């Protein structure tokens, strides 16, 4: 199954495509000083829930980068009330961002689109104007395993904060997903994929979708639930 198709199935029921609530994301209104006239860039925007919320209330100029056409179709069909958002379909790494040109640069759960957390932060800071906000959300390590399992694990929140600051943005705020937030997010994926499989018993991708769903659920239960969290860091560029 094509990964874009899989994620369109797994996230069919959700607009906020991260393990965090709308209430927590609305804190970014203040942390990023959202107001009329700002230029906002959202890397791996998905359905662009956050940027669309801002554009409903403020006359921002937004750009969303996204690889999945299903997510972009969803976002494009919901025109914002005040601002304007342009969407660019394709790999984020192919987008040439003018240096020092955006007031807010977001990447929530999609640092892989820029090569990983460190590379994403470097790219984002370069695109942000001095005084602007860099907003990056990613998996973080909460509890190290008692025995070395030799599996790749993300940085912890303090290490992630250090990466942002070393690249020239002073971290001014953090938002953390709760265990319940992540449980709900993972459960949405699992439920949506199982429902799709029941509704499409003869689909050629059915077995692959179920295999990927089981792998994701197992990773949540065995790795995310006991050891990992998800953290948004807000950095103000020097």
Where does each model-flagged region fall?
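A short glycine-rich, Lys/Arg-flanked "PGG" loop and its adjoining helix->strand segment in the class I
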Residues: 118-133
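Conserved Class I S-adenosyl-L-methionine
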Residues: 177-238
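A short SAM/SAH-binding and catalytic strip from SAM-dependent methyltransferases
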Residues: 104-117
């Amino acid at each position: 199954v094509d990964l874009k198709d899989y994620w369109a199935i797994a996230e069919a029921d959700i607009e906020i495509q991260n393990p965090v609530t709308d209430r927590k994301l609305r804190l970014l209104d203040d942390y990023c000083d959202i107001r009329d006239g700002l230029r906002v860039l959202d890397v791996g925007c998905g359905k662009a829930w956050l940027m669309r919320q801002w554009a409903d209330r403020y006359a921002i100029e937004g750009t969303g980068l996204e690889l999945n056409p299903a997510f972009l179709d969803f976002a494009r069909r919901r025109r914002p009330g005040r601002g304007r958002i342009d969407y660019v379909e394709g790999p984020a790494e192919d987008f040439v961002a003018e240096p020092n040109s955006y007031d807010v640069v977001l990447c929530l759960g999609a640092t892989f689109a820029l090569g990983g957390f460190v590379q994403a932060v470097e790219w984002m800071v370069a695109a942000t104007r001095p005084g602007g906000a860099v907003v990056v959300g990613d998996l973080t390590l909460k509890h190290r395993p008692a025995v070395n399992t030799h599996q790749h694990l993300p940085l912890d929140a303090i290490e992630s904060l250090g990466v942002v600051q070393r690249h020239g943005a002073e971290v001014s705020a953090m938002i953390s997903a709760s265990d319940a937030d992540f449980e709900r997010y993972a459960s949405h994926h699992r439920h949506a994929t199982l429902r799709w499989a029941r509704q499409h018993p003869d689909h050629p991708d059915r077995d692959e979708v179920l295999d990927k769903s089981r792998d994701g659920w197992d990773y949540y239960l065995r790795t995310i639930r006991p050891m990992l969290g998800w953290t948004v860091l807000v950095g103000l560029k020097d």
